[in-house]
């Protein structure tokens, strides 16, 4: 029998009390919890859970992601593998599941409901998962829920394909995650009544309050891409009596340079610093995801799996030790989860481009331009006089209007989609990426066509990755796994990403906090307001392509 004991101040979240205790662990489970008379400087509590994340956004395979986040007390994630599913289909999902099983960390994957985010009528992905594919996935024990339903128009209009996907989960008593930013109350009601139970896309507290009143659960998101904590954290105190079971924390997208510094523990510390009830905050971080998603993660009760964390600081939640299934996976600054060098998979069929491929023309006097916002994945739409791009529709550096392009990476010789974007701030150069939500085609923005072409061909030569360049220098961060993930450690990936980002800001001149991250969401046509994909400029509000 594998038996050991720890002594620490036991944080009993359920009964809202803290007391010194001796906790016995046997065969990976909590065997006993006994009060003791002692003065102790350590605290023990259940591990943290990220209630919605795309592991691929960290540029790390699951095992290497786990190696990093156990340092911050995270023991489990509710993971949506729709990034790799858009590239490699079910093979990509299986890649994530199989890699995750090589570690003690608890990954709970969902079946991606919208691959692509919209139908192939609207964008080109590497694969399409139809309702029959989803039904087969939902039969698997490794699939715990239906991941975020982004096609809100399909839900509201009762499109048979998306309704079948939702019902496939519900009939198996598996939950359905939502994604519904900016809907009117009437449309939100229709969306929620389909059986969708969560949303992590609330941008305003009013939207969140209304969804809570409908019985939905709200995930307070504070990740690398979108940051909504400041807008939504008052819900924690508002909901302490009525809706405390209905809140969770998530990152959604987490870049390695951010999670080197912390994960859900940072949100917990921040919420407590804002004066919210200590135990309510921990309930949101540790307990609510377990109960909602019905996942086998321990809550530090007798008989539970021994998933817990130890800290000396219940203000910052700097972690000293992390245990999963009774095994020590992080110990005083050292992660004990092994790094795994996976064999890459990919899906890339795109040949070299020429400068002339990036030409643009229109006869329209006024043309729509994407207006990006730092640290947000939404955009605004603005109209400009086409004379600002005279004489040959190039980027206008003085007005900060840059050409943006999407290249279909899956079907060679497809027409390049071209538009214009404001607020990027690049003065002399280009950046590009195959991390382009959600279909992950090649997305580029630059100060002229020559730079765009050079960045495109650098990415094509490497079959994916992140790129930034000017006349003097080209930097490429290789992402050999589906053009989304690296085989390297988090520390090395973070170092590369920081170097790229610094180059984008300090050399190319971008004023955005994270230019590559912002660029990656300019193609996500299920988040308002104006986006671009491989088939053209898309107005999310009117749900149609925009003619130039």
Curated annotation (Swiss-Prot):
Plastid is among the record's keywords: no
InterPro entries: Adenine_deam (IPR006679), Adenine_deam_C (IPR026912), Amidohydro-rel (IPR006680), Metal-dep_hydrolase_composite (IPR011059), Metal_Hydrolase (IPR032466)
Family: Belongs to the metallo-dependent hydrolases superfamily. Adenine deaminase family.
GO molecular function: adenine deaminase activity
Catalysed reaction equations from the record: adenine + H2O + H(+) = hypoxanthine + NH4(+)
NCBIfam families for this protein: ade (TIGR01178)
Disulphide bridges, residue numbers: none
The protein's enzyme class: hydrolase
Domain of life: Bacteria
Gene Ontology biological-process annotations: adenine catabolic process
Gene giving rise to this polypeptide: ade
Cofactor: Mn(2+)
Family matches, as Pfam families: Adenine_deam_C, Amidohydro_1
Species for this entry: Borreliella burgdorferi (strain ATCC 35210 / DSM 4680 / CIP 102532 / B31) (Borrelia burgdorferi)
Keywords: Hydrolase, Manganese, Plasmid
Enzyme Commission code: 3.5.4.2
SUPFAM superfamilies documented for this protein: Composite domain of metallo-dependent hydrolases, Metallo-dependent hydrolases
Protein name: Adenine deaminase
């Amino acid at each position: 029998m594998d038996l050991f004991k720890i002594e620490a101040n036991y944080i009993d979240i359920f009964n809202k009390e803290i007391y010194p205790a001796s906790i016995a662990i046997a065969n990976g489970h909590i065997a006993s919890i006994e009060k003791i008379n002692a003065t102790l400087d350590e605290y023990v509590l259940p591990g943290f859970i990220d209630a919605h994340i795309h592991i691929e956004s960290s540029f790390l395979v699951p095992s290497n992601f786990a190696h990093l986040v156990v340092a911050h007390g995270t023991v489990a994630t509710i993971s949506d593998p729709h990034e790799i599913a858009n590239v490699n289909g079910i093979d990509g999902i299986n890649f994530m599941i199989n890699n995750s099983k090589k570690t003690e960390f608890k990954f709970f994957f969902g079946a991606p409901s919208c691959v692509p985010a919209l139908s192939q009528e609207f964008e080109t992905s590497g694969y399409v998962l139809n309702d029959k594919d989803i039904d087969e996935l939902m039969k698997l024990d490794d699939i715990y829920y239906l991941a975020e339903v982004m096609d809100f128009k399909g839900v509201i209009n009762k499109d048979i394909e998306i309704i079948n996907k939702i019902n496939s989960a519900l009939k198996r008593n598996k939950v359905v995650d939502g994604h519904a930013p900016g809907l009117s109350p009437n449309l939100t009601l229709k969306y929620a009544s389909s059986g969708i139970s969560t949303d992590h896309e609330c941008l305003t507290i009013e939207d969140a309050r209304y969804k809570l009143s409908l019985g939905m659960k709200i995930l307070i998101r504070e990740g690398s891409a979108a940051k909504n904590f400041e807008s939504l954290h008052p819900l924690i105190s508002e909901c302490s009596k009525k809706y405390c079971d209905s809140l969770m924390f998530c990152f959604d997208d987490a870049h390695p340079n951010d999670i080197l510094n912390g994960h859900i523990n940072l949100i917990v510390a921040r919420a407590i610093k804002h004066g919210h009830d200590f135990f309510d905050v921990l309930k949101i971080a540790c307990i609510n995801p377990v109960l909602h998603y019905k996942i086998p993660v321990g809550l530090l009760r007798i008989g539970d799996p021994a998933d817990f964390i130890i800290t000396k600081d219940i203000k910052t939640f700097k972690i000293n030790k992390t245990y999963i299934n009774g095994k020590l996976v992080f110990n005083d600054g050292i992660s004990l989860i092994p790094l795994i060098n996976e064999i890459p998979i990919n899906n890339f069929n795109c040949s070299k481009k020429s400068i002339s491929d990036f030409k643009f023309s229109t006869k329209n006097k006024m043309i729509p331009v994407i207006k990006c916002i730092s640290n947000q994945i939404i955009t605004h739409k603005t109209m400009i006089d086409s004379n600002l791009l005279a004489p040959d529709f190039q980027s206008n550096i003085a007005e900060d209007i840059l050409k943006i392009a999407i290249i279909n990476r899956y079907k060679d010789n497809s027409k390049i989609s071209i538009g214009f974007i404001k607020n990027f701030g690049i003065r002399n150069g280009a950046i590009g990426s195959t991390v382009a939500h959600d279909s992950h085609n090649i997305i580029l923005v630059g100060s002229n066509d020559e730079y765009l072409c050079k960045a495109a061909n650098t990415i094509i030569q490497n079959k994916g990755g992140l790129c930034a360049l000017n006349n003097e220098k080209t930097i490429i961060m290789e992402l050999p796994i589906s053009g989304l993930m690296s085989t390297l450690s988090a520390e090395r990936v973070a170092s590369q990403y920081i170097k790229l980002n610094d180059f984008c800001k300090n050399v190319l001149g971008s004023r955005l906090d994270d230019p590559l991250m912002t660029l990656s969401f300019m193609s996500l046509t299920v988040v308002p307001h104006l986006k671009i994909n491989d088939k053209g400029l898309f107005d999310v509000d009117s749900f149609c392509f925009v003619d130039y």
